[in-house]
Amino acid sequence: MPCRTLTYSSEADWQGIRDMLCGRENPENSVEPVVREIMDAIRSDGDAALAGYTRRFDCPDFDPSSLRVAPDAIEKAAREIPRHDLQIITEAADNIRHFHSAQKEEAWFITRPDGTVLGQMTRPVDSAGLYVPGGQGGNTPLISSLLMNAVPAQVAGVPRIAVTTPPRKDGTLNPYILAAAHVLGLDEIYCAGSAWAVAALAYGTQTIAPVDFIAGPGNIFVTTAKRMLIGTVGIDMIAGPSEILIIADSQADAAHVAADMLSQAEHDPLASAILVTPSPQLAAAVHTELEKQVTGLDRADIARASLRDWSAIVVTPDLNSAVELSNKVAPEHLELLVQDTWGLLGSIRNAGAIFMGPHSPEPVGDYFAGPNHVLPTMGTARFSSALSVQSFCKKSSIIAASQTFTQTNAAKIARLARLEGLEAHARSVESRLS
């Protein structure tokens, strides 16, 4: 059988499922010393350290003078890739921009009867660094990662956006990444990968100016570097392996369910694909489909490892129990393959993104629909959200107190200050009474 079959009807059942999922946690502590050494080297030696790591791990003959991609190389890549592919990238970017434009927040103000004005101002960060993974040595360009990270930053109004991505063995970048950058109007692109690229974005080098915020997925070294830089720069999130949970009733198409589970399982041996259904018949049919469909995949070994180790088909007493389990898992991707998707939606509390109905498989959102595919994983959808325009913004409160407000409330404010042992605070407000 391609993956285990479980049941869920009690807290004890949940403990078993939770233990299975928790086993996927990356042992970040194991690489911390290595990442710390990399970060220290970048901080002290800048471009020289960056070039050294790039020669060692990516391109043996890397020329430091090619660290930043020349503008004409970006334009050339856009001309070289098939025109049809460029049109697809452009349309995907337009869809993503259209969705994220709805997330923009304007400044707002309220005025009290005494004339006091209170409000909130939203401003973008001054600069953002985007990390785009290499994708099998640059052979599988992660175009969607660039689009999903760059577009919300642009909609937010970030003035400077820098992109880093590891070079191929010959020192070049995949032309599809450069073409996507051209479509987006990005021209600050650097040939650098892994933890040394993240450190360069945070600390700066002779060539790369430091940024205020870093976003983008990566391996355990990238993730560890981002986590260790919290407080130095803002980061998008600490993401774990990809995951999908599908709630399906007896009317769901088993072939569709299996295909959607495999769309996540092929990502990574640590990826998780879970079907939750009240239908034993569907559960059995999906098992059969998984075995049939996995055979034809180029990444079949990866998918099989994911299905075997971290995936499951869970049979529940009813749909309510399926929703209950889903809310406990808090999946990155949640598909609702049930007859009344909108009726079930109101019961969903925890999910990174929700895919509704048979025509909304997860890849539709991953690539093209418009919502962001940078989503919370490992149960963090209980308290966090997808990458968005707000991720690249800061909010400042505005307080313009009237004389009447301050003088009327000075004694109360001073009393609160003195209760906290802060005499200077009390005197500050009392000085406005004279």
From Swiss-Prot:
InterPro entries: Ald_DH/histidinol_DH, Histidinol_DH_CS, Histidinol_DH_monofunct, Hstdl_DH. Substrate binds at S242, Q264, H267, H333, D366, E420, H425. One of its GO terms (cellular component) is cytosol. The active site is at E332, H333. Pathway: Amino-acid biosynthesis; L-histidine biosynthesis; L-histidine from 5-phospho-alpha-D-ribose 1-diphosphate: step 9/9. Its EC number is 1.1.1.23. Binds 1 zinc ion per subunit. It comes from the Bacteria. It is an enzyme of class 1 (oxidoreductase). It catalyses: L-histidinol + 2 NAD(+) + H2O = L-histidine + 2 NADH + 3 H(+). Catalyzes the sequential NAD-dependent oxidations of L-histidinol to L-histidinaldehyde and then to L-histidine. Belongs to the histidinol dehydrogenase family. This is Histidinol dehydrogenase.
